[in-house]
């Protein structure tokens, strides 16, 4: 019996890997990385999701929705319509938090269109939402697959923070976290902060300090990956429901970028998925990152210590008055790999070819 079962599983994994024979969407290719995409869909979130679903290196185990670019309700609707378009009702899609931990929600229809998907109306979803609360689903999957799940958050970090607050025991069981957020070269919301971090700084600080392997794919590297007219034209040459939807979304974004004098749209969220596919796409040295939660001008900034040490100042009493004296350097332990450079052309080619089904 055991032999028969082994034969059956070997045949199954073979068939799954041969294109066009049998590829039940519910099963990832053998050895594919299990990911949970936590997203606020969102135009570039849509690109991230479709890249993940079209990449055999990844096995999307769940999609959890967080408010950010759009409200929680609109985000869930968008996620459901997208998985339906991709014929992937097998993937659980769960709503999560309704608002950031300690502040009011800020939504970004200004950038993402009134429905969050570049005003492209997808058909109603055939898929139903998973009844579980997003953070609970994250906990359940991490516990079901210890050391196998990679979390890919591409929105505010509220759901991830709620998951670790509820069950801190999942932290050592997560394989890694690859998040889109932050910047070490200024923000997009204001001079200091990037949107995903700004929209829930306390949650972000919890996620950065949790103590798990974490890669930050920030604004500054995303800004080096511009999807422009050349890529749009390539994507327009092939067709299919997902291909055409992606063409519409990227056209909306390219036109938007041109209105602001840019030559293309930054691939923020899809790049985080790209790094999950191939970590070599970015150069990411280890640093210690803290999230500023109080600064008057800097709330939501990711403050990265690039030297991984700080000066040790000790208070001394002198006849002329008290002062601090630098006595040495203290090591700071890195808590993140921070992306500082990216193979942009390679990534853009990967994105277009995957969306074309290659
Ligand atoms: C991030 O903010 C959102 O608008 C995008 O989806 C991306 O996740 C970029 O700052
Ligand atoms: Ca996003």
Enumerate the language-model features and the residues they cover.
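Conformational coupling and interaction surfaces
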Residues: 31-32, 50-51, 59-60, 198, ...
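Bacterial N-terminal signal peptides
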Residues: 10-24
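A glycine-rich helix N-cap at a beta->alpha junction
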Residues: 82, 86-94
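A residue-level signal for conserved active-site and pocket-lining positions in enzyme catalytic cores
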Residues: 93, 207, 273
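Surface-exposed loop and adjacent secondary-structure segments within mature catalytic domains
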Residues: 94-124
């Amino acid at each position: 019996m055991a032999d028969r079962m082994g034969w059956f599983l070997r045949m199954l994994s073979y068939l799954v890997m041969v294109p066009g024979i049998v590829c039940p969407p519910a099963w990832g290719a053998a050895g594919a990385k299990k990911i949970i995409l936590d997203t606020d869909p969102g135009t570039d979130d849509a690109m991230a999701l479709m890249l993940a679903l079209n990449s055999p290196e990844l096995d999307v185990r769940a999609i959890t929705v967080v408010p950010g670019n759009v409200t929680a309700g609109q985000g869930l609707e968008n996620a459901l319509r997208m998985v339906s378009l991709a014929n992937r009702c097998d993937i659980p899609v769960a709503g999560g938090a309704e608002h950031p931990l300690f502040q009011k929600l800020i939504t970004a229809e200004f950038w993402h269109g009134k429905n969050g998907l570049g005003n492209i109306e997808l058909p109603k979803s055939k898929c139903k939402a998973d009844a579980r609360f997003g953070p609970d689903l994250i906990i359940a999957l991490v516990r079901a697959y210890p050391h196998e799940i990679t979390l890919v958050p591409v929105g505010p970090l509220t759901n991830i923070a709620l998951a670790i607050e509820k069950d801190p025991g999942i932290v050592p069981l997560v394989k890694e976290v690859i998040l889109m957020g932050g910047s070490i070269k200024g923000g997009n919301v204001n001079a200091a902060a990037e949107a995903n971090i700004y929209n829930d700084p306390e949650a972000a600080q919890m996620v950065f300090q949790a103590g798990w392997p974490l890669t930050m794919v920030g604004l500054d590297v995303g800004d080096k990956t511009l999807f422009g007219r050349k890529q749009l034209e390539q994507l327009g040459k092939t067709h299919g429901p997902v291909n055409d939807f992606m063409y519409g979304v990227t056209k909306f974004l390219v036109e938007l970028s041109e209105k602001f004098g840019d030559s293309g749209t930054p691939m923020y969220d899809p790049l985080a998925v790209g790094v999950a596919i191939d970590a070599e796409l970015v150069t990411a040295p280890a640093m210690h990152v803290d999230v500023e939660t109080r600064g008057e001008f800097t709330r939501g900034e990711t403050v990265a210590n690039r030297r991984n040490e700080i000066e040790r100042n000790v208070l001394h009493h002198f006849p002329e008055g008290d002062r601090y004296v630098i006595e040495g350097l203290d090591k700071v332990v890195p808590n993140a790999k921070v992306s500082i450079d990216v193979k942009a052309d390679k990534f853009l080619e990967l994105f277009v070819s995957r969306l074309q089904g290659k």
